[in-house]
Amino acid sequence: MSLPKAQILVVVTVGGSTNSAPILEICSILAARGHTIDFATLSGRQKLVDNYPFVKKVHIVGPAISAEEDEKHYILFSRWNWNTARGKRDIVKGKMAFDAFWPFTYRGLKEVITTTKPDFIFSDFHVEAALDVCNEFRLPHAVMWPQMPWLMMPQKYIPGQPGMQQRCLTSEHASIYDRLFEMTFLLRSAPFFLHWIFWTKAMRRKEGVAPRPRHSKPDYLVFMNNFYGMETPRDTPPLVHPVGPILADSYPALDGDIKSFVETHQKIALVAFGTHVILDDGKIFKIIDGLADAISSGVIDGVVWALSARSRGQLDTSIRVPSLHLSHLTIDQLFKNQDQAWHFATWVPQRSVLEHDSTIIFVTHAGPSSVNESIFHGVPMVAMGIFGDQMVTTLRLERSGVAVRLDKETFDAASLTTAIRTILLFDKESFQRNVKRMKRIAMVGSRKKHFAANVIEEHLYDWDGRFENSILDLKACSNRKRGFLQASNSKDMYPRGKELRPMHLQTPDVRMSWIKLNNIDVALLFFILLGIISWITRAAANMVRL
């Protein structure tokens, strides 16, 4: 007996390939099983599906982000700082710049759903509008996160919010000061976050959309492109699953100049800070100087640096390289690879470089994709987070024993050289052991994308069967006859009828009252009975005395 096939709509808007690739990798499995995959995004981002030919149709649900706006946004994010008023203000401004696309996305998604009638929505965690339309149309939904979601599933042993921790990831070995620091972060940052909350409420009110109720557990599927070993283990409900690292089965091979460079060196440091990070000249010069010192001391013999055009654009390339070992070159000459120990490019086939035996260390911004790839290919890291979840990822890497963490505000050339020497010389045995351990865990975890596809199908079929009418069956019948039912009202768009049972993966506690959940009524009854027994006992004792 074959299972019914569904139409799945993937939604990625302000996120890039780091956000879309894990979702589309899972969808490639679903497409192979016969499901139809559509993709919704902002104008100008259609290229996100270029490597995924199974995507049937691309829908535009919002305006393009101009190159100028995009650069301005990431320059703002590159100043990320949790500990200053200006830094917190910039963080909130960046979040609001992303969220400003919510009205366009909300209206665009409603139109796409009305015209195409998907059976399931699979969205990136940035797309708040997907949650709203799924609630409105009663659609099953999955969300992909790079880490545990914030403001959900709190644990007593985890202080603070995931993604916002700066000092400690758990309370296990943390001082009382560090625990208080993490636990009070939102309180100390309240003025900035309240501004965002009020702004968001006003934006939703303008569209006539009520605030979504906040739950301690999600009422939809949550996947994380991460794995335990990086993430702190915690109790999670059946709707939440770490399924990472999600990686493509194939990747671009080495060729041309980069292949020649890698094959003619034995101890290469790969340097890459991602597509969106914009490094200022001070940081770039300190990294160059630190790497030059490492080359001079013989710890490494070559550097492959994928330096984005945006970061290059911040530099005066006519000046001499501010390093004792490279002062005979200008920045422009160094970027043109006129020193045989250095290879610069705006893009390199990162996974192929990491997989090569010559690559022995990775200097990275600790972005989710880069970290997953580095662990999977067994390369230790010097991790320097620049913004967002990169900051806490460096803490996780340090705890896992596969990286030395540097602070973007305080590091210098000497600290970078020391970090490289620590990994490759001083603590080499410890790092090799931990890298091997994490690599093997990641290799097993990379198979979980098939499990994620299974869970999506399971949730889809449960959702379809827990109402009076099966939409998948109705669609199958209408396709054989005269077409699916048309409706102008969103509530009637999917004629499911009455809800007969709850989600089978949802734990019952979220549907229970606080009194029943905590057995307050049972405790109250117990104390009443205890009081009655005590009163009867006392009364009987008094009667005996008489």
Curated annotation (Swiss-Prot):
One of its GO terms (cellular component) is membrane. It is a single-pass membrane protein. Pfam families: UDPGT (PF00201). Pathway: Secondary metabolite biosynthesis. The chain crosses the membrane at residues 517-537. It is an enzyme of class 2 (transferase). Induction: Expression is induced in the presence of 6mM glutamine. This is UDP-glycosyltransferase FPY2. It comes from Fusarium mangiferae.
